[in-house]
């Protein structure tokens, strides 16, 4: 673990950033704009650790500036930050207070830093996010169509669904073209797609949401994806192991990939069946398959080796 001489917490919003730099002990606010962020990052050395909550595209300028400056940063799940604040006795919540708590989190917890994404991955992430939005809109419209009060309304909704289908198809074409045009993305995608169950959607989410894949250990990537089980124990009580936190899009994509894998590959089907025969619930067994898939993918990208069919284990 690299010991940081300077920990910085940043609360990110659409229009501004609230910063608490523990080295100076003062909070400040700047515009969430390229020029202001560049000036801010120029103050820090490469031994700084910057922590902020994952906020989708609002932190993109910040991430790119930190990457260019060679400064380590960690994006954390907002729930994890809030739990830390409560455990520290901080119940008040304002943007400056949040920034201060994130700096304290950086010092106390030393979170794993994020592998900065390339411009191509950032472009892919924007397309993937828009695709996710359109898919969610389509699902809503399909529900409305099933509840339509008359045929005319159902047909009106159906026309909108067709528009969404066309837009989704267009974005998927752009995504495929971008992946093929970028050698690093194309190579990673080829490795991922060789694994049974990993289709284009899971591949897209892993490319955009897990740039660390292949660069960290299995426990670390499982924690980032929210697939690492944690204990719920107290005294003599032994609760069920649970998963949570992490990157929801990655976790959801791997869960669907696990469903496909147990249908298509004997290795994963046998692993799933053993867990079920041992009394594990179906959902827990699928989560275990998802974690196994992630572990395999991580090793493949680390070693740059394509998937090979292995005997059931």
For each feature predicted by the language model, list its residue ranges:
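Phosphate-backbone recognition surface of nucleic-acid-processing proteins
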Residues: 200, 205-278, 282, 309
């Amino acid at each position: 673990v690299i010991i940081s001489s300077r920990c910085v917490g940043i609360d990110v919003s659409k229009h501004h950033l609230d910063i608490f730099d523990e080295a100076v002990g003062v909070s400040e606010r700047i515009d969430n704009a390229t020029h202001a962020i560049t000036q801010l990052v120029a103050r820090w050395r490469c031994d700084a650790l910057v922590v902020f909550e994952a906020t989708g595209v609002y932190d993109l300028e910040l991430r790119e500036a930190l990457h260019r400056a060679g400064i380590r940063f960690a994006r954390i799940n907002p729930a994890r930050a809030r739990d830390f604040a409560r455990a520290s006795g901080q119940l008040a919540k304002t943007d400056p207070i949040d920034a201060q708590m994130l700096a304290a989190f950086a010092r106390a917890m030393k979170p794993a830093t994020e592998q900065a994404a390339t411009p191509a991955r950032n472009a892919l992430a924007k397309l993937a996010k828009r695709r996710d939005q359109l898919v969610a809109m389509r699902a809503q419209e399909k529900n409305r169509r099933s509840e339509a009060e008359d045929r005319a309304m159902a047909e009106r909704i159906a026309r909108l669904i067709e528009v969404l289908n066309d837009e989704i198809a267009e974005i998927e074409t752009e995504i495929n073209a971008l992946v093929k045009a970028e050698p690093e993305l194309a190579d990673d995608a080829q490795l991922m797609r060789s694994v049974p169950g990993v289709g284009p959607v899971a591949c897209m989410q892993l490319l955009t949401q897990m740039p660390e894949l292949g660069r960290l250990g299995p426990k670390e990537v499982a924690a980032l994806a929210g697939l690492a089980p944690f204990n719920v124990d107290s005294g003599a009580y032994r609760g069920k192991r649970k998963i949570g936190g992490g990157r929801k899009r990655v976790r959801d994509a791997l869960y669907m990939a696990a469903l496909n894998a147990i249908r298509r590959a004997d290795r994963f089907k046998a692993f799933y069946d053993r867990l079920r025969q041992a009394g594990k619930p179906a959902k827990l067994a699928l989560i275990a398959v998802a974690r196994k898939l992630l572990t395999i993918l991580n090793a493949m990208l680390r070693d740059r080796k394509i998937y090979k069919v292995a005997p059931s284990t």
